[in-house]
Swiss-Prot record:
Protein name per its UniProtKB record: Holo-[acyl-carrier-protein] synthase
Main location class: cytoplasm
Lineage: Bacteria, Pseudomonadati, Pseudomonadota, Gammaproteobacteria, Alteromonadales
CC cofactor: Mg(2+)
Top enzyme class: transferase
Amino acid sequence: MAIVGLGTDIVEIERITAHVARSGDKLAKRVLTDAEFDIYQQHSQPSRYLAKRFAAKEAAAKALGTGIGRGVSFQHIHIGNTPDGAPTIDFTEGAQQRLALLNGVVGHISIADEKSYAIATVILESR
């Protein structure tokens, strides 16, 4: 296997918290898939959850080489978790098409946060 994409993004959690305070769930509905939005609504720290998902999806879009736009939407990237809590990444629609163009078959993701920031790194591998 070879690495065909690498992306990293960092988000200031307070910036997301302020956006949610101003605009309610507007950003969450734009960024999160339906399954992610359900978790967001039940989460004990929804702004922190949203910041981590935002960073993860931006990192994934960078790894795909497109950023958000150019056929890749936030909705085309789903961040989940294994039963043990490790993050997972899945691609659909435009993101899946872009991954195929790179001959990519699997994405690896790491997400971390501390008091003020959320950061994510995505590595895409080919066959």
